[in-house]
């Protein structure tokens, strides 16, 4: 039994948003989903976008009111900041002086609050509602009367209503249908960054590339290496998603299970664990945050170089060719 506090529809009081206007700043992956779900839930919504934003026409076509970020914040009681992390401090500077005491400033990720890139006035509520899914799935699940699990955190609560407002917002976008876990800005930020770097985005892709290279260097065909190290990963992850590691072990062959159980720890060994701990420490002590902030201030030279190298890896060309040759199912 988990010790986590999890909220569902019955725990949220939707009426706390009845007399409120919500500004959604940004209309990207999360922004479009939040704004449309809030609107469909009967919440008064205005979308904040630059005058020259390419998303303005899309938001207007979806039937939403659109203003500049500052104009939207002036109208709103709750401002949901859903532009990219790297843009948020500049956007906050545009709206800071129009936030009134008791207003709520809300985020979907804690980076800028946790690392001090945004320092709100003490008389403003600061909350986080973070769906644990890409925006298009948040929207699709809502339309299908399903939910998307999410996180809720309160950083400061001068009005005494921050928690209730965040929970009502989470319900309005469909998260409490599935369940909303209570957390903190620190916990969400640090676990999210660590998971991305050590496992989900960094660890997995490096493991896949290294496995692919090992097979190709040993004389096996790139196509077979691609299938065994990248393509089949989805099949395994789907099983883990549905029922944890045990579901996966129960579903694969005995040979695969024995081989994985006896060889897996030789790959992710004590040295890998030490490196994971180093990555976590860099997240905790702010080393990564300072590095990423400096990288953006310098115009992202390392980021661009690393991205180009990834796109030019042999596994990308092999995968593109194979995906064009096979009739893939929807799943």
From Swiss-Prot:
Its EC number is 1.1.1.86. Mg(2+) 1 binds at residues 192, 196. The lineage of its organism: Archaea, Methanobacteriati, Methanobacteriota, Stenosarchaea group, Halobacteria. It catalyses: (2R)-2,3-dihydroxy-3-methylbutanoate + NADP(+) = (2S)-2-acetolactate + NADPH + H(+); (2R,3R)-2,3-dihydroxy-3-methylpentanoate + NADP(+) = (S)-2-ethyl-2-hydroxy-3-oxobutanoate + NADPH + H(+). Keywords: Amino-acid biosynthesis, Branched-chain amino acid biosynthesis, Magnesium, Metal-binding, NADP, Oxidoreductase. It comes from the Archaea. Disulfide bonds: none annotated. It is an enzyme of class 1 (oxidoreductase). InterPro entries: 6-PGluconate_DH-like_C_sf (IPR008927), KARI (IPR013023), KARI_C (IPR000506), KARI_N (IPR013116), KARI_prok (IPR014359), NAD(P)-bd_dom_sf (IPR036291). This is Ketol-acid reductoisomerase (NADP(+)). The keyword Cell membrane does not apply. HAMAP family: IlvC (MF_00435). GO terms for biological process: isoleucine biosynthetic process; L-valine biosynthetic process. Involved in the biosynthesis of branched-chain amino acids (BCAA). Catalyzes an alkyl-migration followed by a ketol-acid reduction of (S)-2-acetolactate (S2AL) to yield (R)-2,3-dihydroxy-isovalerate. In the isomerase reaction, S2AL is rearranged via a Mg-dependent methyl migration to produce 3-hydroxy-3-methyl-2-ketobutyrate (HMKB). In the reductase reaction, this 2-ketoacid undergoes a metal-dependent reduction by NADPH to yield (R)-2,3-dihydroxy-isovalerate.
